[in-house]
Amino acid sequence: MAAEGRVQRVASEFQKVISLLLRTRIKDAKLASATITEVDLSKDLSYAKIYYTCLAIEDAEYIDKAFEKSKGFFRSSIAKSLSLRIVPNLKFIYDTSLDYGMQMEEKIQQALEADSKIIKQDDKSLQENYKQNDKETKAEKLR
């Protein structure tokens, strides 16, 4: 249990260090625009999956290649910043959860709009039924 807490703390520090490096030390504007969303470390701290996202989806492939080329820089910078016996192997992965969330949000909005149209149609039908019933009731009273 304590090991899991340590892994989470180290992962949090990794995220902070890499984010800081992206903001301060990376000169490539596209790569610097990436946002680190999560760091997943193995229990023995030998492997790190670093999830990132970027505003321009079309830049994702370029950024992936740039991260791949910059692995050594990030590993050495992490080694200097954090006191770890072993600096993990880094794997940068594009985080699709934001894109997925946006797609889900769009589908929800479409469903809400469709529901709204159905409700409006049902309201019109009900109003017409009430009017028809009122006319019939008035006609019966007049007889």
From Swiss-Prot:
It is found in: Cytoplasm. InterPro entries: KH_dom-like_a/b, RbfA, RbfA_dom_sf, Ribosome-bd_factorA_CS. Gene3D superfamilies: 3.30.300.20. Pfam families: RBFA. Residues 123-143 are annotated as: Disordered. One of its GO terms (molecular function) is ribosomal small subunit binding. The lineage of its organism: Bacteria, Pseudomonadati, Pseudomonadota, Gammaproteobacteria, Thiotrichales. One of its GO terms (cellular component) is cytosol. The keyword Cytoplasm applies. It comes from the Bacteria. SUPFAM superfamilies: Ribosome-binding factor A, RbfA (SSF89919). GO terms for biological process: maturation of SSU-rRNA. It comes from Francisella tularensis subsp. holarctica (strain LVS). Keywords: Cytoplasm, Ribosome biogenesis. Belongs to the RbfA family. One of several proteins that assist in the late maturation steps of the functional core of the 30S ribosomal subunit. Associates with free 30S ribosomal subunits (but not with 30S subunits that are part of 70S ribosomes or polysomes). Required for efficient processing of 16S rRNA. May interact with the 5'-terminal helix region of 16S rRNA. This is Ribosome-binding factor A.
